[in-house]
Amino acid sequence: MNRKVSKFLKDYRVILLIVLVAASITAISTMGIQQGLDLQGGSLIQIQLERPVDAATMNTVTSVLDKRLNIFGVKDVKVRASGDQNVIVEIAGVQPDQVADIVGKPGKFEAKIGNETVLTGTDIVSVQPPIITGNEWEVPFRLSTDGARKFAEAARGKAGEPVKMYLDDRLITAPEISAEVATGKPVTDVRITGAENSKAEAEVQAKEIETLLKSGSLPVKVKIVGVSSVSPELGKQFAEGAVIAGLLAVLAIAVILIVRYRSPILVLPIFFTTLAELLLILGAAAVIRWNIDLAAIAGILAAIGTGVDDQIIITDEVLSGEGRRTRRKFRIKDAFFIIFASAGTLIAAMLPLAYIGFSRGATGIGLLAGFAFTTVLGVIIGVFITRPVYARFIETFNVAGRK
């Protein structure tokens, strides 16, 4: 027996599995598993651009939105493109009404003297923190040298005329040109001022303007077409439900295997192989920072169920044959022919679902992208890593006579 154990542990497939399981445990413990919004709570905002855009423009849009939300003070933000006309914003632990105004505005700044645009957002080089005094607020910012020069030329000789400052075509303030500025002397330090009904409203308005000025304008107009949220309490309930579902699935599998084989040497290896498969899936998810949500959990359960099916196929093929070594090898080859055919069919069925899911984003059928991805990942891990190890165990320890 000791010689068989030594031979089994020296097999390259077994060594590979042990190394990958150890790496997965390390990845899970150090990197953690990212939970989807339906498990940890948070908000999901779907934004639609006014027209389809190319990859470079889409990168600009997602970059500006990500910058805005970080400046606004929102943590755990994920902004990603969904096709060529939609953007998905995922925010953990934040209600959507707190950030919807920020992500849904173009952020276009203009300053006009008369009907002439004298400043735009591109002329701003830095924005200072807002100053709140009672219900009044001001947001100081600094102009570039070229912007200050353009403004000075436009303001020359126009003392007392208003400088109308617009944000997304909405008039924010209209300070008068001072006598000093009207001389044509460039001024780099400018400020936007205003007043609200309360100090709290003043703080919100000033923070929003600071955020929009700092992040810059979006290259295209956008609109919010979908908003959803899950409270942390509800997310906790979902997570608990998923754990219960997983435990019930394990219990059901255990009952079926015990009833079918009535032998620990047949049942325990299937459980250890299944556990290894689960660790590899979660480890891969931790490394690539893949969100584990309810759909992904369903995919994991489907992959594990498929894995148990495959191990039953291998076991039954060996048990139905004669005890000779050559016969066992042929039986295992027959089993793997069935397993590969089944895996190919399943992957072929999942790929269109994954494609549609990724192209649609995290709404509607897009939620099933997580299901398809984790199912395919689990099947690939099983077929190329865990199934061969289980087959090697069956072959090495000659389970044909142990039923």
Curated annotation (Swiss-Prot):
Translocase is among the record's keywords: no
Keyword Protein transport in annotation: yes
GO BP term, example: intracellular protein transmembrane transport
Record-linked InterPro entries: SecD/SecF_arch_bac, SecD/SecF_CS, SecD_arc, SecD_SecF_C, SecDF_P1_head
Pfam families per UniProt: Sec_GG, SecD_SecF_C, SecDF_P1_head
Recorded topology in the membrane: Multi-pass membrane protein
Localisation per UniProt entry: Cell membrane
Transmembrane regions listed in the UniProt entry: 14-34, 238-258, 265-285, 294-314, 336-356, 365-385
SUPFAM superfamilies the UniProt entry points to: Multidrug efflux transporter AcrB transmembrane domain
Keywords for the protein's UniProt record, in alphabetical order: Cell membrane, Membrane, Protein transport, Translocation, Transmembrane, Transmembrane helix, Transport
GO cellular component: plasma membrane
HAMAP family: SecD_A
Job of this protein: Involved in protein export.
Family membership: Belongs to the SecD/SecF family. SecD subfamily.
Subunit field text: Part of the protein translocation apparatus. Forms a complex with SecF.
Designated name of the protein: Protein-export membrane protein SecD
Source species: Methanothermobacter thermautotrophicus (strain ATCC 29096 / DSM 1053 / JCM 10044 / NBRC 100330 / Delta H)
